[in-house]
Structures are given as C-alpha cells and as structure tokens.
Curated annotation (Swiss-Prot):
Organism the protein comes from: Xenopus laevis
Extracellular face residues: 234-237
Segments in the Cytoplasmic topological domain: 1-212
Biological processes annotated in GO: detection of light stimulus involved in visual perception; G protein-coupled receptor signaling pathway; negative regulation of signal transduction
UniProt function note: Regulator of G protein-coupled receptor (GPCR) signaling. Probably acts by regulating the activity of some 'R7' family protein (RGS6, RGS7, RGS9 and/or RGS11).
Membrane spanning stretches: 213-233
UniProt key word RNA-binding: no
The protein's name in its UniProt record: Regulator of G-protein signaling 9-binding protein A
Localization per Swiss-Prot or TrEMBL: Membrane
Family designation: Belongs to the RGS7BP/RGS9BP family.
GO CC annotation: membrane; neuron projection
Membrane topology of this protein: Single-pass type IV membrane protein
Coiled coil regions in record: 29-58
Length: 237
C-alpha cells in the first residue's frame, strides 16, 4: 500500500513538473501575459508541495531497517526518479527567473519573441492543478513581485536537495532500471501504431531510408555532371 502511495505521489509530481516546464518555455513569447505569470506561480507552488510530500514519504520509508531487499531496491529506484524530478524543477525555476527578469510585462525591456506559438496556457495550468478551470486573482505587478518569491524558493529548493542527500544516500549508479532505455516510448509507439493517422516506427524508418537513398542518388548525379563539365572546360581551353 505504501509503495502504491509513493508511486501515485511521484506520478503527480512528474505531471506537474512537466506542465511547469511547458509554461516556462512560453515566458517572453507572444503567449506571455499576467495570467501566465500567475499560472507559473501556482504550478510551481503545487510542484513544491508534492516535492515535500514525496520527500517525507520516501525518506521515512528508506530509513526503515525492516524493509526487505526487494522493497528497498524498489524504493531506491523511486528515490532516484524523485531526485531527477527535483533537478528538473530547480533548473526550470532558474530558467523562469532569468526569463522573467529579461521580459517584465509592465516595463518591457525587449520585444516579445515570435515563437510561432499561439493561444493561452490555461489548459496546461489547469491540468497541473487538477482543476477544470483556472481562477485568476493576482495583482497587476505579479511579474515583478513573484520574482522575489521565486528567488527565495530556488534557494530553499537547493537547501532541501542538500538535506535529502544528507538523510538518504542513494548513488544513482547503484540503482538498476527495470526497463531498457526507451522501452516505454517504444511500447507507446507500438500501441498507437494501429490508430488512424499514426505512422508506425517501422514505416517511419522505411521512409527515412528511402529519403537517404534518394538524396544519395541526386548527390551522385550532380557530382558526375560537375566532373563531366570540368573535363569539357579543360579540353576546350
């Protein structure tokens, strides 16, 4: 039961961290707005709440000497995944801080970047918050005020990760993966290969091979023509 609870918490953190990264990538773009900055703040806070819950559960579990060898190996694997999520979250928080400083909303220093993206980001934020719709209630200067909070939270995140390493030492290279690299992606591709509009991995590979062959033939033909022309020029001269 505890194992399933840890997996559920980790899945939730994974989802929210992914949504946060998606939102961070839109800072400074044409989709940037006050609503986006509020979505970033709420999503970041949700991720930190889940991070604390994951840390508490996994730390107390891994310090339990009654764990069997199999259970310990599984929880260590979950710990490594959790640590990776934390690294990603901290990296994205730092990126959000830099971009937020470069692209303030009310006193713009630079023009917004034409990224090609359009539309709002409320759907992504709502998914992270597990809500149907987002409610916006932030002040107009959230783009400036939140940067101070974000900077403090980055420092707290670093302290939290340091404390984690001191309490539980699980070297990543000692944990064995349960699947081969890319196994999950391959299973998703094979499962969706029969769906309409989805090209299978093998078909995609065949198309790529055909394109390479065609490119090689065209290049060879151009090279031969160039050689013939060069010979003709030499003879005529």
């Amino acid at each position: 039961m505890l194992k399933e609870e840890c997996k559920a918490l980790l899945d939730a953190l994974n989802k929210v961290t992914g949504c946060y990264r998606h939102l961070v990538l839109t800072i400074g773009g044409t989709s940037d707005s006050q609503n986006l900055r509020e979505e970033l703040k709420k999503t970041r806070q949700k991720a930190q709440e889940l991070a604390v819950a994951n840390r508490n559960t996994l730390t107390s579990t891994l310090k339990d000497h009654r764990l069997t060898k199999e259970d310990k190996a599984e929880f260590e694997r979950l710990w490594v995944i959790f640590s990776t999520c934390m690294d990603i979250l901290e990296t994205d928080m730092r990126r959000a801080l830099v971009l937020g400083q470069e692209f303030p909303l009310n006193i713009p220093k630079k023009h917004l970047i034409q990224t090609g993206m359009s539309g709002g980001t409320s759907g992504v934020a709502a998914r992270a918050m597990s809500a149907q719709n987002m409610r916006y209630e932030a002040e107009h200067n959230i783009d400036v005020m939140d940067l101070k909070d974000l900077e403090n939270e980055i420092n707290l995140m670093g302290e939290m990760m340091y404390e984690m390493e001191m309490k539980v030492s699980v070297p990543q290279w000692t944990v064995e993966a349960k699947q081969d690299p890319g196994a999950e992606l391959k299973s998703i591709m094979s499962a969706g290969a029969s769906s309409p509009g989805i090209i299978s991995l093998d078909a995609h590979k065949s198309i790529c091979d055909l394109s390479k062959i065609l490119a090689g033939v065209v290049f060879s033909a151009v090279l031969i023509i160039a050689i013939v022309l060069a010979v003709c020029v030499v003879k005529l001269s």
